Amino acid sequence: LETEEINRIMERAIRSSDRWRSMKREGKSEEQIRASFKEKREMTVFDWNSDTQEKDTIMTPLDSIRYYKTFLRSAMMSMEPQTGHVKAWVGGLNYKHFQYDNVIQGSRQAGSTFKPFVYAAAIDQLRYSPCDELPDSQYCIEAGKHGNMEPWCPKNSNGKYSGQMYTLKHALANSVNTVTAQLIDRVGPKPVVQIVNDLGLTRDILEVTSIALVTEEFNVYDML
Protein backbone atom coordinates (compact mmCIF):
# COMPACT_ATOMS: atom_id res chain seq x y z
CA LEU A 1 0.00 0.00 0.00
CA GLU A 2 1.05 3.57 -0.62
CA THR A 3 1.83 5.73 2.42
CA GLU A 4 -1.19 7.92 1.70
CA GLU A 5 -3.52 4.91 1.75
CA ILE A 6 -1.97 3.60 4.98
CA ASN A 7 -2.49 6.99 6.60
CA ARG A 8 -6.14 7.01 5.53
CA ILE A 9 -6.69 3.55 6.98
CA MET A 10 -5.05 4.50 10.27
CA GLU A 11 -6.97 7.77 10.55
CA ARG A 12 -10.27 5.97 9.96
CA ALA A 13 -9.37 3.38 12.62
CA ILE A 14 -8.38 6.06 15.14
CA ARG A 15 -11.59 8.02 14.71
CA SER A 16 -13.78 4.91 14.96
CA SER A 17 -12.03 3.61 18.09
CA ASP A 18 -13.69 3.46 21.52
CA ARG A 19 -10.96 5.71 22.93
CA TRP A 20 -11.66 8.48 20.41
CA ARG A 21 -15.42 8.33 20.91
CA SER A 22 -15.16 8.17 24.70
CA MET A 23 -12.83 11.17 24.92
CA LYS A 24 -15.02 13.10 22.48
CA ARG A 25 -18.01 12.52 24.78
CA GLU A 26 -15.92 13.79 27.68
CA GLY A 27 -15.37 17.03 25.79
CA LYS A 28 -11.66 16.53 25.15
CA SER A 29 -10.10 18.48 22.29
CA GLU A 30 -8.77 16.73 19.21
CA GLU A 31 -5.25 17.70 20.26
CA GLN A 32 -5.72 16.04 23.66
CA ILE A 33 -7.19 12.93 22.09
CA ARG A 34 -4.35 12.54 19.59
CA ALA A 35 -1.80 13.05 22.37
CA SER A 36 -3.39 10.22 24.38
CA PHE A 37 -2.89 7.87 21.43
CA LYS A 38 0.88 8.42 21.74
CA GLU A 39 1.17 7.68 25.47
CA LYS A 40 2.57 4.25 26.30
CA ARG A 41 0.53 2.12 28.69
CA GLU A 42 0.15 -1.45 29.87
CA MET A 43 -2.34 -3.46 27.87
CA THR A 44 -3.30 -7.01 26.98
CA VAL A 45 -3.43 -7.79 23.28
CA PHE A 46 -4.26 -10.77 21.10
CA ASP A 47 -1.37 -13.13 20.37
CA TRP A 48 -1.47 -16.23 18.15
CA ASN A 49 1.58 -17.75 19.87
CA SER A 50 0.17 -17.79 23.38
CA ASP A 51 -1.86 -20.66 24.84
CA THR A 52 -4.39 -18.10 26.03
CA GLN A 53 -4.18 -16.13 22.75
CA GLU A 54 -3.19 -13.08 24.82
CA LYS A 55 -0.04 -11.33 25.94
CA ASP A 56 0.67 -8.46 28.30
CA THR A 57 2.74 -5.68 26.81
CA ILE A 58 3.45 -1.97 26.86
CA MET A 59 2.62 0.08 23.79
CA THR A 60 0.77 3.19 22.72
CA PRO A 61 -2.88 2.98 21.63
CA LEU A 62 -1.68 4.08 18.19
CA ASP A 63 0.76 1.17 18.07
CA SER A 64 -1.98 -1.21 19.19
CA ILE A 65 -4.14 -0.13 16.25
CA ARG A 66 -1.22 -0.66 13.89
CA TYR A 67 -0.56 -4.07 15.50
CA TYR A 68 -4.13 -5.25 15.06
CA LYS A 69 -4.11 -4.13 11.42
CA THR A 70 -1.47 -6.80 10.73
CA PHE A 71 -4.01 -9.60 11.28
CA LEU A 72 -5.95 -10.98 8.33
CA ARG A 73 -9.68 -10.75 9.07
CA SER A 74 -11.75 -13.58 7.67
CA ALA A 75 -15.06 -15.29 8.25
CA MET A 76 -16.78 -18.58 7.56
CA MET A 77 -20.36 -19.78 7.67
CA SER A 78 -21.37 -23.34 6.75
CA MET A 79 -24.98 -24.23 6.05
CA GLU A 80 -26.69 -27.51 5.22
CA PRO A 81 -28.35 -26.85 1.83
CA GLN A 82 -31.17 -29.33 2.36
CA THR A 83 -32.38 -27.85 5.65
CA GLY A 84 -30.85 -24.39 5.95
CA HIS A 85 -29.36 -25.39 9.31
CA VAL A 86 -26.23 -23.42 10.19
CA LYS A 87 -23.46 -25.90 11.01
CA ALA A 88 -20.61 -23.46 11.63
CA TRP A 89 -20.31 -19.70 12.15
CA VAL A 90 -16.88 -18.14 12.62
CA GLY A 91 -17.05 -14.37 12.70
CA GLY A 92 -13.42 -13.64 13.44
CA LEU A 93 -10.22 -14.53 15.26
CA ASN A 94 -11.15 -13.90 18.88
CA TYR A 95 -14.28 -12.09 20.01
CA LYS A 96 -12.69 -10.60 23.12
CA HIS A 97 -10.14 -8.70 21.05
CA PHE A 98 -12.01 -8.40 17.73
CA GLN A 99 -15.61 -7.58 18.61
CA TYR A 100 -16.74 -7.50 15.02
CA ASP A 101 -18.65 -10.31 13.30
CA ASN A 102 -17.30 -10.55 9.76
CA VAL A 103 -20.04 -13.02 8.81
CA ILE A 104 -22.84 -10.50 9.11
CA GLN A 105 -21.15 -7.12 9.58
CA GLY A 106 -18.26 -7.24 7.12
CA SER A 107 -19.20 -6.67 3.47
CA ARG A 108 -16.86 -7.33 0.57
CA GLN A 109 -17.18 -7.41 -3.21
CA ALA A 110 -18.63 -10.81 -4.02
CA GLY A 111 -16.56 -11.24 -7.17
CA SER A 112 -17.05 -14.49 -9.06
CA THR A 113 -19.38 -15.94 -6.42
CA PHE A 114 -22.06 -13.76 -8.05
CA LYS A 115 -21.66 -15.40 -11.47
CA PRO A 116 -24.04 -18.33 -10.78
CA PHE A 117 -26.89 -15.80 -10.54
CA VAL A 118 -26.10 -14.57 -14.05
CA TYR A 119 -26.03 -18.13 -15.39
CA ALA A 120 -29.24 -19.00 -13.53
CA ALA A 121 -31.02 -15.99 -15.06
CA ALA A 122 -29.84 -16.96 -18.56
CA ILE A 123 -31.00 -20.56 -18.09
CA ASP A 124 -34.33 -19.43 -16.65
CA GLN A 125 -35.10 -16.57 -19.05
CA LEU A 126 -33.38 -17.65 -22.28
CA ARG A 127 -33.76 -21.41 -21.83
CA TYR A 128 -30.04 -22.02 -22.15
CA SER A 129 -28.67 -25.35 -21.00
CA PRO A 130 -25.33 -26.05 -19.28
CA CYS A 131 -24.23 -27.71 -22.53
CA ASP A 132 -24.77 -24.62 -24.72
CA GLU A 133 -21.55 -23.04 -25.95
CA LEU A 134 -20.24 -19.48 -26.21
CA PRO A 135 -16.84 -18.24 -27.43
CA ASP A 136 -14.06 -17.15 -25.11
CA SER A 137 -13.16 -14.01 -27.03
CA GLN A 138 -12.99 -10.30 -26.29
CA TYR A 139 -16.49 -8.95 -25.77
CA CYS A 140 -17.70 -5.38 -25.30
CA ILE A 141 -21.10 -3.99 -24.36
CA GLU A 142 -21.42 -0.57 -25.92
CA ALA A 143 -22.13 2.67 -24.09
CA GLY A 144 -25.83 3.40 -23.74
CA LYS A 145 -26.87 -0.26 -23.58
CA HIS A 146 -28.24 -1.53 -20.25
CA GLY A 147 -27.57 1.91 -18.80
CA ASN A 148 -23.81 1.77 -19.43
CA MET A 149 -22.22 5.22 -19.37
CA GLU A 150 -19.24 3.91 -21.33
CA PRO A 151 -18.23 0.72 -23.16
CA TRP A 152 -17.76 -2.26 -20.83
CA CYS A 153 -15.11 -4.73 -22.00
CA PRO A 154 -14.21 -7.12 -19.18
CA LYS A 155 -11.07 -9.22 -19.41
CA ASN A 156 -10.38 -12.70 -18.14
CA SER A 157 -8.32 -12.92 -14.96
CA ASN A 158 -5.21 -13.92 -16.93
CA GLY A 159 -5.75 -11.16 -19.49
CA LYS A 160 -5.95 -13.71 -22.31
CA TYR A 161 -8.65 -15.09 -24.62
CA SER A 162 -8.47 -18.71 -25.76
CA GLY A 163 -10.75 -18.24 -28.77
CA GLN A 164 -12.33 -21.60 -27.97
CA MET A 165 -16.00 -22.44 -27.58
CA TYR A 166 -16.87 -23.23 -23.97
CA THR A 167 -19.97 -24.86 -22.57
CA LEU A 168 -21.71 -22.81 -19.90
CA LYS A 169 -20.78 -25.53 -17.42
CA HIS A 170 -17.08 -25.19 -18.28
CA ALA A 171 -17.20 -21.38 -18.36
CA LEU A 172 -18.78 -21.16 -14.92
CA ALA A 173 -16.48 -23.79 -13.41
CA ASN A 174 -13.46 -21.89 -14.74
CA SER A 175 -14.85 -18.41 -14.06
CA VAL A 176 -14.52 -17.17 -17.65
CA ASN A 177 -15.38 -13.46 -17.57
CA THR A 178 -15.98 -13.07 -21.31
CA VAL A 179 -18.74 -15.69 -21.32
CA THR A 180 -20.37 -14.13 -18.25
CA ALA A 181 -20.33 -10.76 -20.04
CA GLN A 182 -22.10 -12.25 -23.07
CA LEU A 183 -24.75 -13.81 -20.85
CA ILE A 184 -25.61 -10.64 -18.94
CA ASP A 185 -25.73 -8.74 -22.24
CA ARG A 186 -28.24 -11.23 -23.63
CA VAL A 187 -30.41 -11.63 -20.55
CA GLY A 188 -30.01 -8.06 -19.21
CA PRO A 189 -29.18 -6.93 -15.66
CA LYS A 190 -32.80 -6.66 -14.48
CA PRO A 191 -33.62 -10.43 -14.58
CA VAL A 192 -30.33 -11.11 -12.78
CA VAL A 193 -31.22 -8.70 -9.98
CA GLN A 194 -34.72 -10.19 -9.84
CA ILE A 195 -33.43 -13.73 -9.40
CA VAL A 196 -31.03 -12.52 -6.70
CA ASN A 197 -33.94 -10.89 -4.86
CA ASP A 198 -36.09 -13.99 -5.31
CA LEU A 199 -33.35 -16.07 -3.70
CA GLY A 200 -33.39 -13.91 -0.58
CA LEU A 201 -30.96 -11.06 -1.21
CA THR A 202 -33.66 -8.45 -0.78
CA ARG A 203 -31.64 -5.28 -1.10
CA ASP A 204 -31.14 -2.59 -3.70
CA ILE A 205 -28.69 -3.70 -6.38
CA LEU A 206 -27.81 -1.48 -9.32
CA GLU A 207 -29.18 -2.90 -12.57
CA VAL A 208 -25.95 -2.52 -14.53
CA THR A 209 -23.86 -5.02 -16.48
CA SER A 210 -20.87 -4.79 -14.15
CA ILE A 211 -22.79 -6.66 -11.43
CA ALA A 212 -21.90 -9.80 -13.43
CA LEU A 213 -18.32 -9.55 -12.17
CA VAL A 214 -19.48 -7.95 -9.08
CA THR A 215 -18.98 -4.43 -8.00
CA GLU A 216 -21.68 -4.89 -5.35
CA GLU A 217 -20.70 -5.75 -1.78
CA PHE A 218 -22.27 -8.51 0.30
CA ASN A 219 -21.49 -10.24 3.57
CA VAL A 220 -21.03 -13.98 4.03
CA TYR A 221 -24.48 -14.31 5.61
CA ASP A 222 -26.10 -12.68 2.55
CA MET A 223 -24.39 -15.07 0.16
CA LEU A 224 -25.64 -18.14 2.02
Residue ranges of model-derived segments:
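Sec-exported extracytoplasmic/periplasmic mature domains
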Residues: 122-127, 139, 173-177, 185-189, ...
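Membrane-targeting and insertion segments and their boundary/processing signals
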Residues: 87-88, 163-166, 170, 196-200
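Extended, non-catalytic substrate-recognition/exosite surfaces adjacent to catalytic cores, especially
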Residues: 1-145, 156-157, 169, 182, ...
